[in-house]
Amino acid sequence: MLKSKFWLIKAPWYVVPYFLLSVFIAGYFYIDPPYKITNNFLSQLGQIYVNEKLNLVSFLLFNIGLFNVGFVISLFYYNLFYFLNVEQINIFFLRALQILGILSGICFAGVGIFPTDITFSYHVFFANYSFYFLLAVSILQTILIFKTNVLSNQYAFGYMMFCVFLALYVRLLLFGGNPAEGMPEGMFQAKHVISQKLIVLTIMIATLHQSIGINYYYKKQLNV
């Protein structure tokens, strides 16, 4: 069950809409003060308490959704190794892609397991490293797609653009300063908050784009 093309083709199309819907509903039920798209991070939806008020509905929706995203990312990259290895290309790069992809998924799941208001240091660790690992993954994946005939180079060019956006976001994480500086308590600078939301959306789109290419390959093989 873990080794299955289901995780490459169908699972992303289940988990991405589910997560996006969870975010919208969690934002609606976010405890007072209202959730602000430009000044509240996504992970604030997953807080257990907001201003000492129980934020149970948003907490459950967001964290379960994000855990599922991390779970699917891990299994996506576990199976991508076998998908790309049909041509016996560089096994070292492939194995590195698999391991780093799984670690990235574990980190995304970790963000959902450790709420920011209860376990802040663990939350920040998993949040940051999910993007660090994913940047390495996106670089390796771009290289490997260029090296193989399994996927068209259009998917490599798409992932190359994703690499650029992700690298800019990682730069912001490392050198963008304190996002809370000069902001009221519980609010953060818009450049950090909006960038986070855009890169998460980009991750979703990039994954679905890859899934389309993989599905096309399998369909083409059936017609050979």
Where are the language model's segments positioned?
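Interfacial/capping segments of alpha-helical transmembrane domains
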Residues: Y28-S43
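Cytoplasmic juxtamembrane regions at transmembrane-helix boundaries
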Residues: L75-I102
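Hydrophobic cores of alpha-helical transmembrane segments in multi-pass inner/ER membrane proteins
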Residues: V16, G65-F76, Y132-Q141, L198-N215
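Terminal transmembrane helical module of multi-pass membrane proteins
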Residues: L140-V224
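Interfacial helix-start motif at the membrane-water boundary
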Residues: Q47-F71
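N-terminal signal-anchor transmembrane alpha helix
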Residues: K3-D32
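C-terminal ends of transmembrane alpha-helices
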Residues: L21, I25-A26, Y35, I106-F120, ...
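Membrane-proximal helix-loop-helix units in multi-pass membrane proteins
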Residues: L100-F146
